[in-house]
Structure formats: structure tokens, C-alpha cells
A protein has these predicted regions:
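Glycine-rich beta-alpha junction loops
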Residues: 129-134, 183-186, 222-226, 268-270, ...
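Short secondary-structure junction/hinge motifs that connect adjacent elements
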Residues: 14-23, 37-44
């Protein structure tokens, strides 16, 4: 019944899965009274999902004007927004300030730029830290690390710069300070957050002693990953939360900072496993390889083409059949990297079969684009009662042409 309700090339999300995951996260950090998750809007900027997560206690991590506007229209404002941006235009700082968001400064030069942009310095403010070098957990890391070389990353301030920023911001009227850092993406290790926490907790204790500022929160940002391959172990958020708690007790509490609130900015972890792209097999091609052409393309899911990322694929109705056929699963873009899978072993695929591409609930639809004049597909929400709700309609040619001047 649900299959008949779904159009071709739809993205569908699991409400129950998202809610239960948000509750597990909240429970894992319940030991910290000020804890708050700011969902990374860039991962899935769809109002129904933002509202759903807000009902579960999550705020919004925004990084652009339109993300701020989406949050506002969802009724999420004030300190329920963390504005973490870089190379930021003045008008975006002005919008964030108007909404009462917590502003996270990416660079020392933004201290004066922010004051010029909004006419003052907020009483509560955050600065992003980049320790430089190469971040490693001292073990073999699984999964595709998008950024684990902070010294080569454009984000954040050096140790000396963040100390100077705190001193200057304090003199300009700031009263509450936060520290933020993001060192690695999609980590499959329960040790990542605890390791990052120790770095930031130690830094906070040092900065408090050096500058005398009141540090009221530490933002661990994102980076907790998901297993895109079935054989990969999932992170255990309860174990992660306990690891962060131990670091908190060992570093912050002895420094007299046992009241510091913890924030996170998880995106992929929150919704990634609970979204799927459904596409139909419409062509087969037999040349030097075996190809299955589907009606979705990289415009619907860019990650395999852009990063070479693996997304598991299920052929609906053939879950128990032997995977004895090797295929490239391709879209119709005029780009040879428009492939969802390369040399993938799957059951025999017949024309008309529905293929489910897994773990597309974050950085999937949101990274879509219109190359070749392709139109973005619809988004659906599988409700807890089993019904399916349209949460974003499919684009039409009229949408595509609307900005053109003929």
C-alpha cells in the first residue's frame, strides 16, 4: 500500500525512527542540565523535519540566510538557533542578531566586522577553534573521513586567536562565552566525541584562567557518523555520552567549571539512517559492463558522484534473493560519475523494479541541484501511524523557469 503511494524518485523519511533517535541522544546527555542539540539544518532543510525535531527538544544549527529564515518560519528563534557560519556577509549577521541566535564566530577578523554589522556585540557569543595539525584517534578509523586534517581546513581560529578574541569581545561587552570545534566528519568511533571533548574542556579551563571570561557552554558540533555499509558497526550514543561525562568530570569539574552546558550540532546522525531515496529501473544496457538505468540521478543524491560514497541498495521484493549479478546503477546525467553504485552485486533487476537507496536522510535531498535541467523530487514522511504525508512537492518545469528572463 505504501509503495503505491510513493511516486518515482521520492525521498521518504521515517518519523518514528527520527523521534526515537532524538530521544536516545537526549538521554545520553541527560547528565548535563544545559545540554541542547542544534540540528544541522544543512543536512535536511525541510520544515516538517525541523518541526519534528524541535518537538523532541532540538534547536537549529544554521549557516546561511535562508536557513535562518526557514528556522524562523518554523517558529524556532532566539537561543534555539546557533548561527555557525564562515566568510559571513553582514546581512546574515544582522538576521541572526534580529532572531536572537547565538552567533559563532569563525575568525578573529569577524570580531570587529560583527560589531560594525550589527552595531554591538551580543552578550552571549561563541568562537570556533581549530587546533591545526592532523586529528587522529590513534586507531584505525572506519568510514569516509571528509575532514580529519584541521591544519588544512579553512575553519576556526588558532589557540592564540581565540584567546585574543575572547579578551576583545569581553572588553566590547560580551558576558557569556562558548567554544566550538569540528575536527572530523562521519566518524565511526565511540571515542571521537570524548576525545574532542577533552581537547575543548582543557582549552576552556586554560582560557578561563588566562582571560577571566565566563565560559558557559561548549559546542561539540557534529562528526558522529552512521554506518553506510551493513557490515559497519553503529556508534553507541549512550557510550559516547558516558565518555564525554567522564572527560567533563575529570577536566571541567576540577577547574570549577561544573556548570558548563554542552551543545551538539548533529545532522547526519539525527536523520541520515531514517531517509531513503526510492527509484525505478527503466533501462538496462549491456556493453563492457552491465548497467541498470534508473529514473533518479546525482541531482537527487550527489554523495556517490561527489565523494565516491557508498550507499546500500535494496531491490524491493527481492531482499531474500541471491546477489549474483554485478551492476553499475546509473542515472541519466551527461556525466560518467552519475552512478549510485559501481560493480555492485545485487539480485537480477528487471525493468520496473523499485530500488531503495539507503541512508539518504542527511546531505541527500539537501545537496540536490538542477544540472541538465533535472528537477528535484518530492519528499515524503512515513508517519508513526503508518500514513504517508507529502512534506515537499516535486519541482515542476515552471519552478525551474521562474528565475529566467526570456
Amino acid at each position: 500500500r505504501r509503495q503505491r503511494q510513493m511516486c518515482i524518485r521520492d525521498s521518504i523519511y521515517d518519523e518514528q525512527g527520527i523521534r526515537e533517535n532524538a530521544r536516545r541522544l537526549r538521554k545520553a546527555f541527560a547528565w548535563n542540565p544545559g545540554y541542547r542539540e542544534y540540528f544541522a539544518v544543512k543536512a535536511a532543510p525541510t520544515p516538517a523535519l525541523l518541526k519534528l525535531l524541535h518537538e523532541e527538544g532540538c534547536g537549529c544549527d544554521c549557516s546561511s540566510m535562508t536557513e535562518l529564515m526557514i528556522s524562523e518560519r518554523c517558529g524556532i528563534t532566539g537561543e534555539n538557533i546557533m548561527f555557525s557560519s564562515n566568510d559571513t556577509p553582514a546581512e546574515e549577521f544582522q538576521m541572526a542578531d534580529r532572531l536572537g541566535a547565538i552567533i559563532n564566530l569563525d575568525d578573529l577578523t569577524l570580531v570587529d566586522y560583527l560589531e560594525r554589522s550589527i552595531g554591538h556585540v551580543p552578550e552571549k557569543i561563541c568562537c570556533r577553534y581549530n587546533p591545526g595539525g592532523v586529528f587522529t584517534l590513534g586507531e584505525t578509523r572506519e568510514g569516509f573521513q571528509v575532514m580529519d586534517n584541521p591544519g588544512d581546513a579553512k575553519y576556526g581560529m588558532t589557540r592564540a586567536q581565540i584567546a585574543e578574541a575572547f579578551t576583545r569581545l569581553s572588553a566590547m561587552g560580551a558576558k557569556e562565552f562558548g567554544i566550538h570545534a569540528f575536527l572530523a566528519s562521519n566518524t565511526l568511533s565511540n571515542d571521537y566525541y570524548p576525545a574532542l571533548a577533552r581537547i575543548l574542556f582543557q582549552l576552556a579551563a586554560e582560557l578561563k584562567a588566562e582571560t577571566g571570561v565566563h565560559i558557559t557552554f561548549i559546542n561539540l558540533s557534529g562528526g558522529v557518523g552512521i554506518p553506510y555499509r551493513p557490515e559497519q558497526p553503529a556508534n553507541d550514543i549512550a557510550v559516547i555520552g558516558e565518555g564525554v561525562r567522564r572527560a567533563y568530570e575529570e577536566v571541567l569539574v576540577p577547574a570549577g567549571m561544573g556548570d558548563v552546558a554542552l551543545y551538539t550540532e548533529l545532522g547526519r546522525f539525527m536523520t541520515g539512517p531514517y531517509g531513503h531515496l526510492v527509484t525505478r529501473a527503466i533501462h538496462e544496457k549491456h556493453i563492457y559492463k552491465e548497467y541498470i538505468g534508473v529514473d533518479a540521478c546525482a541531482c537527487n543524491l550527489m554523495r556517490p558522484a561527489m565523494y565516491g560514497s557508498y550507499h546500500h541498495i535494496t531491490v524491493m521484493g527481492k531482499e531474500d534473493q541471491l546477489c549474483d549479478h554485478k551492476y553499475d546503477i546509473a542515472g541519466s546525467l551527461c556525466e560518467n560519475n552519475d552512478k549510485f553504485a559501481v560493480d555492485r552485486m545485487l539480485p537480477k533487476i528487471d525493468m520496473g523494479d523499485l530500488l531503495v537507496i539507503h541512508d539518504t536522510g542527511a546531505h541527500g535531498f539537501s545537496m540536490g541541484y538542477n544540472y541538465n535541467g533535472k528537477l528535484r523530487s518530492a519528499e515524503l514522511l512515513l508517519k508513526e501511524d503508518g500514513s504517508v504525508e507529502l512534506i515537499r512537492r516535486a519541482e515542476t518545469p515552471e519552478d525551474y523557469f521562474r528565475t529566467l528572463v526570456w
